[in-house]
Amino acid sequence: MTEALGTVTPGMRNFTINFGPQHPAAHGVLRLVLELDGEVVERVDPHIGLLHRGTEKLIEQKTYLQAIPYFDRLDYVAPMNQEHAFCLAAERLLGIAVPRRGQLIRVLYCEIGRILSHLLNVTTQAMDVGALTPPLWGFEEREKLMMFYERASGSRMHAAYFRIGGVHQDLPPRLIDDIEAWCDPFLQVVADLDRLLTANRIFKQRNVDIGVVTLEQAWEWGFSGVMVRGSGAAWDLRKAQPYECYAEMDFDIPIGKNGDCYDRYLIRMEEMRQSVRIMKQCIAKLRAPDGQGPVAVEDNKIFPPRRGEMKRSMEALIHHFKLYTEGFHVPAGEIYAAVEAPKGEFGVYLVSDGSNKPYKCKIRAPGFAHLQAMDFICRGHLLADVSAILGSLDIVFGEVDR
């Protein structure tokens, strides 16, 4: 009997732990159920939906103008980039073109949004692996950019500044001057971050060869943005399928070689420099003679008339009343419009039945595709690497849960 008992080997049992939903490295309300064999991750099960608000369904009950603020609340780190996709989709269904000055302002603020997003990601990624200084420097610069948002739209985050047909109102000359004055000192801050992190031995040990994604895997999983460029593909919608006035802009697409967390960090650092290049070009074009003019279409059946005009014209008052009560009707049809948001390809599939409300508005969030790959990326890594990988995916739960 004792011999029989002696031959029984105890069964090995994996350990299951919860990561989140209130974990400082979860970047929102993420719950990961991790199955561990010692310190090694065997399986990752993301539990999403904790920030689900039914955005797509809510938009169906709203006019096209009332739908715009919902897009600010998706990727709330860079709000105007999402508004851009929805406005482009509606404009293509309406068959209208945004005036050149309106396009330049849109591109300028989309690049500000890209820097807002990358600054947050790069600095919090550093914080996730133990560095404290980068977030303090990064948030100081983000504060200045938030002020530019506020001076254009009145709001630091939920701007609702883009409109179908253009932008809400023109930028004052002093704001354009201040944005230009911000650019060069910011490049120095990027250089300081670069010096602090890029060659740092501990930072490299935590990121090099961690979370490697091959190019084939990136395409199979529906990745976009930095996740694809980190694996070696120069795929950027601003170059591949130019929209607005991006075709005129001179900028480079940084790509990685290894597809690891470190490459994705380097790409985001370089993209911030390229965004500043685009911003400087936008500012120069806004000051040029051909950059003057209206910032939105002058069809008062789509874009509301100005206050001064409403005090003089009865028709303007009628148009204003109709637009803010019933809204405008969009011709029946369906369209897919995508923009290169900071986190990847943000797409809006808009279906109109000819009424004043969208029949269906399907949102394609880049973070959703990236999060579903957490299982295959993390498998075989250590528990400590999970937060580094999650940080390099750049996920925001407003857009994942919608």
UniProtKB/Swiss-Prot annotation:
Reactions catalysed according to its record: a quinone + NADH + 5 H(+)(in) = a quinol + NAD(+) + 4 H(+)(out)
Enzyme category, top tier: translocase
Subcellular location(s) per record: Cell inner membrane
Subunit structure: NDH-1 is composed of 14 different subunits. Subunits NuoB, C, D, E, F, and G constitute the peripheral sector of the complex.
Keyword Glycosyltransferase: no
HAMAP family: NDH1_NuoD
Any Pfam family matching the protein: Complex1_49kDa
Membrane topology recorded in Swiss-Prot or TrEMBL: Peripheral membrane protein
Keyword Cell membrane: yes
Family matches, as PROSITE patterns: COMPLEX1_49K
NCBIfam families given in the database record: NuoD (TIGR01962), PRK06075.1 (NF004739)
Protein family per UniProt: Belongs to the complex I 49 kDa subunit family.
Alphabetical keyword list: Cell inner membrane, Cell membrane, Membrane, NAD, Quinone, Translocase, Transport, Ubiquinone
Name by which UniProt lists this protein: NADH-quinone oxidoreductase subunit D
Gene Ontology CC: one annotated term: plasma membrane
GO molecular function: NAD binding; NADH:ubiquinone reductase (non-electrogenic) activity; quinone binding
This enzyme's EC code(s): 7.1.1.-
Function: NDH-1 shuttles electrons from NADH, via FMN and iron-sulfur (Fe-S) centers, to quinones in the respiratory chain. The immediate electron acceptor for the enzyme in this species is believed to be ubiquinone. Couples the redox reaction to proton translocation (for every two electrons transferred, four hydrogen ions are translocated across the cytoplasmic membrane), and thus conserves the redox energy in a proton gradient.
